Amino acid sequence: MKRTINEVVGSTSVNTLDSSIAKKPVFLTKKQREELALKRRQDQISEQRVRREQLGRPEPETEDVSNGDTNRDKDRDRDRDRDRERDRDRERDRGRDRDRDRDRDRDRDRERERDRERDRRERDREPDRRNREKEREEEVKAREKARVEKLVEREKEKELDAIKEQYLGGKKPKKRVIRPSEKFRFSFDWENTEDTSRDMNVLYQNPHEAQLLFGRGFRAGMDRREQKKQAAKHEKEMRDEIRKKDGIVEKPEEAAAQRVREEAADTYDSFDMRVDRHWSDKRLEEMTERDWRIFREDFNISYKGSRIPRPMRSWEESKLTSELLKAVERAGYKKPSPIQMAAIPLGLQQRDVIGIAETGSGKTAAFVLPMLAYISRLPPMSEENETEGPYAVVMAPTRELAQQIEEETVKFAHYLGFRVTSIVGGQSIEEQGLKITQGCEIVIATPGRLIDCLERRYAVLNQCNYVVLDEADRMIDMGFEPQVAGVLDAMPSSNLKPENEEEELDEKKIYRTTYMFSATMPPGVERLARKYLRNPVVVTIGTAGKTTDLISQHVIMMKESEKFFRLQKLLDELGEKTAIVFVNTKKNCDSIAKNLDKAGYRVTTLHGGKSQEQREISLEGFRAKRYNVLVATDVVGRGIDIPDVAHVINYDMPKHIEMYTHRIGRTGRAGKSGVATSFLTLHDTEVFYDLKQMLVQSNSAVPPELARHEASRFKPGTVPDRPPRHSDTVYIN
């Protein structure tokens, strides 16, 4: 049954009232719902019209209610358009939000990337900053320490002065009392310099003055013979002048007396010492004690020991055999060096020798020639005695030095036919042992490899009575003291020299002879000398540990980061000359060589990490001038002779001054000049004192930073860093 809209509305209102009581739902059809919605719409339009009329607004055009379907379509279209427009607005807003979010994310990523880059730069700068801060802190601490020490020293001086004044009494200044004679002395109107009076006697106008001849071997610098001759000449001139002034002719008796006086002045007595000729113009028989003293002073030779023979002045006076003299001439040695002058005569007398000489002074020939002369007196090697081992052993700290000594020994033994064998690491020990068992007169070895051969029975030393320790201090520093002692203990001890220093040695008898050469004398070397050497003669050429005067030393203070740039600058100035760059570590050696190679330099390396074959190739290439820059560790710093090295650069300063001496000794050899440049930083304070002393002794320039540094004032270990005692009073401003 269908109902009208009014009935529906009425029933709805009634049902609404009843729903509050019965709460019974009313179900409407679709048409009823549409009519209800249209009714509500008309009610809303009526309400809006009433509201506009109340507000005085014009009434909009009303819609025809009768056109229900048309209005509904329009409403649907309008709602759809409105929804579509709203969707577009929302989509547009969402697009703007997405763009804004994307831009915000992009900005955030940029900021994060900038933060990461800034953190990366900070991390890169952090080591340099820490180093600068550390250096700054060290400088501040050093200045503060120096200031405190100065204050403490000043207070100690004040305290000492107060104690002296309390117990000894202070010196009171005395008031000068003017004597009456001085108080009332007559004052002239002129000065003493205006006095024109002269001594009337001519003898007193030109008084005779004795000339002191210091440095010519005279006592107090006075040569009595020269003084008498000058006095006689002065007297003759004065007499001639007086006779000429008075017009007196010299009588024959006076002339004869004058000749007698001149002859007496020229006559030698027991106190006179002849100065007529230099020692180089005299024969060996004419040399006096004074001549030998001048000779030793000229070559800076000093001895310590008893019954010391005279040094040799030339190869002709050396008492070497003709074969050795021919080999010396063939090697191009025209004049002996000071260490050769002093050590060869000692070796020919079978004396134990400790030689201390500067680097590059010819120490190799100083012990090789006496060794060859000693072997020449022994029976030749045969099948019967080949198994007893060599006649002589030479020990060196490094392979390169051992091979260099082998080359020199072969050169000097050219006319004698002696066999020389080197035993070093990096090669087959079986092959080296076979060479020894096949027979050789001389073995040149490193201590470690030689003791291995002895322990494995590849070699024996049953007839070895001549041993040389070259660069003994270096072997001790490298920890070879037990190996050296083991080799010396393996030698026969039946023919040791007598312990009595005054007892003469029998020249026909074979004694055990030990040569020890070193640039310095550390305690380890002294221990070996006391145990194994009998009455040794210590020969010192120059000052122990001193560098040759042919080396020009330069020290440059800088930061660690400035080293490579300064190295390139020095190498650019080098031209075609050769240079050795010393560093402390193998890693740094390879790194610097790689960077120099990239920069276009002809560079090679040499350090302990290379095989023996690689080391020989590098060294041979540098000697042959295929490379002009050698970057090396201290393996090259001792004993190795590389000719014509113009410049030595200490890229890293060594920890001990002895190693510095040997490093720069690679230049300035064989009478040629050289340059040594050292890069110094504030991390090298342990060598500041010794380096400053060496620069001062060699008349080299001392950088102001080194001269003023606290570490250069005191030798390390002599001023302990102790806290102030309770009795100390320290004032700090």
UniProtKB/Swiss-Prot annotation:
It catalyses: ATP + H2O = ADP + phosphate + H(+). Residues 129-159, 219-248 form a coiled coil. Residues 39-147, 705-733 are annotated as: Disordered. A motif (Q motif) lies at residues 313-341. SUPFAM superfamilies: P-loop containing nucleoside triphosphate hydrolases. Residues 344-539 form the Helicase ATP-binding domain. Its EC number is 3.6.4.13. ATP binds at residues 357-364. It comes from the Eukaryota. The keyword Coiled coil applies. A motif (DEAD box) lies at residues 470-473. Belongs to the DEAD box helicase family. DDX23/PRP28 subfamily. The Q motif is unique to and characteristic of the DEAD box family of RNA helicases and controls ATP binding and hydrolysis. This is DEAD-box ATP-dependent RNA helicase 21. It comes from Arabidopsis thaliana (Mouse-ear cress). The gene is RH21.
